[in-house]
């Protein structure tokens, strides 16, 4: 059978069985998989994978082993009942291997009052499925599994190996993917179906969390002039951070960031301080996220922020005597930069063009993924492409469009066949003749 005929057969199967993908996504959304609660959602993934006759590896990442790796950054103390899953379909040989990586963990739902429907009810309405994780990224995971199911149902034989990974902890720094790398899983390329709105992200921003402590001097609120308000001093710190963000982003000239207003944000996420309404606050803690451009090293970015805040002492004597304290904690996502001429791009472009009859948009991501770990720790080049829009991720009323999810599954199926290569019955016959 010609490659075009095989591709047509796979696409027709996906069209005819779209209800399977919808049911799977609803089941995945229905299993809440926030930090430490991933077990039941992974059980759904495992049940599906067992239908594909793949070699399956299930394990709980080891904190002891992970702590030995320099890229391990996580707040977790253990991964009890938070298993990783890797399923491998061994190819016939002679093709390129591929990792299909998706994270099963989701961020908390926040206030249920802000939701149109229950966050884990998975309601379908007007071509959209609502629920926490629908876009980030159970819709993408469903697209991967649906593509694999089509290849299995159509008895497609590949030359290269395919490794499907359903990992934990991406939202907290990527310990699940790092554990898979340390377990030996690598490939010639990888695709992560994060919500890119069907764009190809060939460069990914990294990020890391910081904590800044600002000191003050406590006093009675009635005589506040005898104290020094850490809250007021923290306003100077925040202004300095905002100025640094402008300086850092002014350096970005990569055209792939042209449509992103702030390519590498420095976001302030939490502020806490003060102990009593009638007291002058003697301490404020600011926590946030600092973006890392694809070409930057995390250590250099850390040093720049620390030195920038150290300069406050030249403008305020208080900071000279009480310098702000900066620490880096919790999660970190490494940046990633795929060369413009890498075959991952051209092969995915070709698959996209076959389905959409138009050129895909190529951009850089405004957020980090596990792609940085796959590349820097696993020596595996990565491209990010998937259904869903970032604007709904991490928000109330998160949703994904069913049509985009099905369409992305088709593109991914075509991509897998082209990247790994098709092994035909004729090649089996030729191999047998040569053997005899």
Curated annotation (Swiss-Prot):
Highest taxon of the source? Bacteria
Q: Which cofactor does it need?
A: Zn(2+); Co(2+)
Gene3D superfamilies, A to Z:
3.30.70.360, Zn peptidases (3.40.630.10)
Cofactor binding note from Swiss-Prot or TrEMBL: Binds 2 Zn(2+) or Co(2+) ions per subunit.
Q: Which UniProt keywords apply?
A: Cobalt, Hydrolase, Metal-binding, Zinc
One GO MF term: metal ion binding
Binding site residues for Zn(2+) 2: 136, 171, 394
**Residues forming coiled coils:** none
InterPro entries xrefs: ArgE/DapE (IPR010182), Bact_exopeptidase_dim_dom (IPR036264), Peptidase_M20 (IPR002933), Peptidase_M20_dimer (IPR011650), Peptidase_M20A (IPR050072), YodQ-like (IPR033687)
A Pfam family that the UniProt record links to this protein: M20_dimer
Positions annotated to bind Zn(2+) 1: 103, 136, 194
The UniProt entry annotates the active site at: 105, 170
Give the EC number. 3.-.-.-
Family, according to the entry, reads as follows: Belongs to the peptidase M20A family.
Checking PANTHER family in the record gives:
ACETYLORNITHINE DEACETYLASE (PTHR43808), PEPTIDASE M20 DIMERISATION DOMAIN-CONTAINING PROTEIN (PTHR43808:SF25)
Under the heading NCBIfam families, the entry gives: DapE-ArgE (TIGR01910), PRK06837.1 (NF005306), PRK06915.1 (NF005373)
Q: What is this protein called?
A: Uncharacterized metallohydrolase YodQ
Per the UniProt record, the source organism is Bacillus subtilis (strain 168)
Quick one: which gene encodes this?
A: yodQ
């Amino acid at each position: 059978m010609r490659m075009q005929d095989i591709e047509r057969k796979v696409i027709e199967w996906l069209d005819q069985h779209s209800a399977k993908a919808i049911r799977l996504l609803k089941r995945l959304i229905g299993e809440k998989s926030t930090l430490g609660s991933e077990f039941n959602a992974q059980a759904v993934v495992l049940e599906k994978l067992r239908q594909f006759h793949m070699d399956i590896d299930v394990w709980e990442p080891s904190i002891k082993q992970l702590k030995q790796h320099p890229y391990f950054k996580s707040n977790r103390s253990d991964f009890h009942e938070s298993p990783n899953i890797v399923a491998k379909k061994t190819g016939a040989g002679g093709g390129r291997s591929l990792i299909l990586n998706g994270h099963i963990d989701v961020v908390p739902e926040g206030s249920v009052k802000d939701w149109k429907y229950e966050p884990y009810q998975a309601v379908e309405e007007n071509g959209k499925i609502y629920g926490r994780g629908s876009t980030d990224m159970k819709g993408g995971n469903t697209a991967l599994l649906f593509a694999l199911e089509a290849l299995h149902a159509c008895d497609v034989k590949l030359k290269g190996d395919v490794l499907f990974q359903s990992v934990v902890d991406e939202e907290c720094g990527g310990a699940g993917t790092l554990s898979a790398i340390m377990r030996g899983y690598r490939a010639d390329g990888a695709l992560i179906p994060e919500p890119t709105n069907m764009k190809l992200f060939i460069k990914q921003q990294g990020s890391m969390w910081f904590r800044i402590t600002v000191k003050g001097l406590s006093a009675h609120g009635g005589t506040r002039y005898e104290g020094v308000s850490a809250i007021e001093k923290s306003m100077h710190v925040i202004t300095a951070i905002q100025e640094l963000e402008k300086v850092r982003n002014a350096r970005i000239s990569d055209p792939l960031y042209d449509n992103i207003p702030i390519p590498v944000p420095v976001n302030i996420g939490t502020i806490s301080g003060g102990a009593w309404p009638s007291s002058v606050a003697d301490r404020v803690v600011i926590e946030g996220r600092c973006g890392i451009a694809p070409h930057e090293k995390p250590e250099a970015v850390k040093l720049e922020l620390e030195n920038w805040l150290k300069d406050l002492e030249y403008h305020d004597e208080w900071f000279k005597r009480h310098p702000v304290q900066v620490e880096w904690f919790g999660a970190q996502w490494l940046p990633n930069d795929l060369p413009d001429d890498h075959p991952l791009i051209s092969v995915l472009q070709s698959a996209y063009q076959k389905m959409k009859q138009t050129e895909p948009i190529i951009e850089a991501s405004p957020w980090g993924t596990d792609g940085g770990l796959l590349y820097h720790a696993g020596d595996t080049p990565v491209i990010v492409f998937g259904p869903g829009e970032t604007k709904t991720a991490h928000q109330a009323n998160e949703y994904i469009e069913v049509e985009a999810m099905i369409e992305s599954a088709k593109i991914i199926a075509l991509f897998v066949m082209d990247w790994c290569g098709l092994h035909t019955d004729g090649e089996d016959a030729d191999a047998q003749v040569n053997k005899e």
